[in-house]
């Protein structure tokens, strides 16, 4: 199967980006003309262009932020005097403005809710009088059907005025939006290009979803977040914070293979999905390896782990979790050792990971002499993606950045601590190879549990020497004089124009007596 690369459909108006973020934009075929009668009255007035200045984190220079970039996308007016857009349009925004079609002025906005895992965000305007003349767009209460006609509204690159393209719904699937979050996704053949992100998709005068991505290696393939996902998001953030989508933390496999069925001694009438090993599973879960999940709620699960969603639509059974979860549990019917059982399986909002993402935050760091320490995050390890040489090297030495990428944290290892920047030039590390990207195993033979724990170990050390072991094969150890490292830190900060030795969370630990 051809693997498709997706672009986040926003306009990157910066003059240049870091080299590994550059992409070649292919020419898009002209969009199909839209008949005037297809445009709902006043809808154009409620689709806005979003301008944002982004200051993303720099995981390799964690004491600073990345250079600002100017981007633009789209948004749509919804109830409650709010603008709905995509998280990737306004994530890490230091400034946001919106502008309505044909308007001469921009209106300042504030990001009040973000769900990066499902790519949704809400804006509030500083001047809410805007909404007196810009009405909310009505949302459809049901999914569109495959082959339904849709219109994509937005402000794609190539012009300043509102663009409307026409297409049909070609596919509806339940797919992964991020590493640990899945949701419904609508595929359309309407042109959805950079800048369309956050614009509404309209069918029969109502919004059926929000544009968020397109395929870079194919023409006229776009993706829409359907209203069901939007409604879940809006309900979640009604209390002022985003908790995340409920998910069943269990790995399963299909039940198609006849030998597997014979091994499980299943009657031909039994269909479902088989529970794999439960190492990542909630200890409170009633599920065991080799259980066969046959139903979720009242929905039968077939041998490909799918449930029916209408006459001509099947999706992964996990889709029902977001509908059926109550009080942190979801009802399942299972077959175990030939017996049918009804169980309540726990659900959670995503998995906790040893290497998490920053989720909209900035990295914590601590500078000790010429060495910068930080937590390993998905953003930090992103340089391995697409870099076969680095990935092979890290795999060969057994770096936890590769070998433990999907692991959960534990009491012994809450997170991975890395040397997040090349050593600052200094005689204290003269003769050592640069340990950028190396994971800390121990300080003076004490295993490091977390970044906070490591800072406490350095603070409380009494020995003349500090011995740093790294978690890999063949990596040299580091031995430095404790007092010299402490004494040199201030001048190293000054020489490199760094204001703070560490982030507040870690300096509070370092300065604690």
Give the positions of each predicted feature.
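C-terminal recognition in membrane/secretory proteostasis and scaffolding
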Residues: 23-29, 38, 53-55, 64, ...
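A conserved glycine-rich beta-strand in the N-terminal activation segment of trypsin-fold
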Residues: 31-37, 57-80, 86, 105-108, ...
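Conserved hydrophobic positions within beta-strands
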Residues: 75-77, 109-111, 169, 275
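A short, Trp-centered hydrophobic/proline-enriched beta-strand micro-motif
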Residues: 43-60
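Bacterial N-terminal signal peptides
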Residues: 8-16
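Active-site region of chymotrypsin-like
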Residues: 46-50, 126-137, 163-219, 232, ...
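Short, conserved beta-turn/loop elements at beta-strand boundaries and strand-helix junctions
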Residues: 55, 114-118, 170-177, 255-257, ...
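Conserved active-site neighborhood of the chymotrypsin/trypsin-like protease fold
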Residues: 79-162, 194, 218, 340-342
